[in-house]
Design a protein with these regions (language model features):
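Noncatalytic luminal/extracellular "stalk/propeptide" segments of secretory-pathway proteins
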Residues: 2-115, 125, 163-165, 169-185, ...
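Extended, regular secondary-structure scaffolds
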Residues: 132, 140-199, 205
Length: 322
């Protein structure tokens, strides 16, 4: 966790080598690092601006916290979503609650067509995976999707915010991927087979798990002026979040400009495999796994799991040796 380690970055190979060395020292029977060449998605440019009724440019970054010097480290990325499409669009903003299909049904009942709009959705209320929100927005014909963490679910509406408590501070961003891997799991270009060197790869345009909609996360601090300017009908009571504004559906008054340029190409990624062969049932498997890449430092996700896994393999290695 000493530095950011996004998937396919050079730092992730260092972490794979650290895990492999730890397992060898712990006494696992075999330890192997496997290289897979996978489709990688990283941002070159992510920009948002409100151009009407007033001009406003959000920071799209997390503010450093004086009590936590690590939040000021270089290399911390701003707002971005892996596997967002690239594009440049100016369109009206629309608030679509959690971005689930029933929310778009409600928008239409209110006379608002999401097609061609930039939809703003919440991470919760109720929860759904950001990739499902993106697919739903894409199917609805939206031009882009902004997903933000409302303080009602992750912020001062729940209690004290970091560093005084566990909840998200005002500028906190929830980065993540939106690949439709719940439809086709694994590397998008090798559906159903391993993404090893020399493997057949389909074109990105044919990969059903690669979104065709632009998407990015924002903090509730950044999104508040935009939500406050939306205008249009009042949102249903169940859609109201924790910001001190009138939650409206938008549709015409507020116009947003979103420009995203993603670098999408095939890059190496590393998987570490360690084995302890059973003495009584060597042909039966118990599989334990955890990813080791992270959106930033990964103190919670994934490194809490990595630390737990390393302690477990240490215990299992000791048992195997004895």
């Amino acid at each position: 966790t000493k530095s950011p380690h996004v998937a396919t970055s050079p730092r992730t190979k260092e972490i794979a080598e650290f895990i492999a060395a730890s397992w060898k020292a712990q006494g696992l029977d075999t330890v192997t690092i496997h290289r897979y060449d996978v489709l990688s998605s990283n941002p070159r440019t992510v920009a948002v601006e409100m151009v009407a009724p007033v001009r406003y440019t959000p920071t799209l970054r997390e503010a450093p916290i004086p009590e936590d010097p690590d939040t000021a480290q270089p290399g911390i990325s701003g707002a971005w979503t892996s596997f967002s499409a690239s594009g440049d669009v100016t369109a009206p903003g629309v608030y679509a609650n959690s971005g689930n299909p029933s929310d778009y049904d409600e928008l239409r009942r209110q006379g608002i067509d999401p097609k061609g709009k930039i939809v703003i959705v919440r991470y919760s209320n109720p929860y759904s995976y950001r990739g499902f929100k993106a697919l739903t927005a894409e199917r609805e014909g939206a031009a882009a999707m902004i997903v933000y963490s409302d303080p009602k679910e992750d912020g001062y509406g729940q209690g004290a915010v970091y560093p005084k408590g566990p909840w998200g501070p005002a500028s906190h961003l929830q980065r993540g991927g939106i690949a439709y891997d719940y439809i086709v799991p694994g590397d998008p270009l090798t559906p159903g087979w391993a993404s090893v060197d020399g493997a057949k790869r389909i074109p990105v345009s044919e990969a059903v798990s690669v979104p065709k909609i632009m998407a990015l996360p924002m903090s509730h601090q950044d999104i508040q002026p935009i939500l406050a300017a939306l205008g249009g009908p009042m949102a249903p009571a169940a859609w109201k979040g924790g910001l001190p504004i009138d939650y409206r559906l938008g549709g015409a008054e507020a116009r947003l400009h979103v420009r995203i340029d993603m670098q999408t190409d095939v890059q190496p990624n590393y998987v570490v495999e360690g084995r302890i062969t059973g003495s009584e049932r060597p042909d039966e498997w118990v599989v334990l796994g955890n990813h080791h890449d992270a959106w930033v430092f990964g103190g919670v996700d994934p490194s809490s799991g990595t630390a737990t896994m390393l302690e477990l393999t240490k215990a299992l290695g000791t048992l195997a040796k004895n």
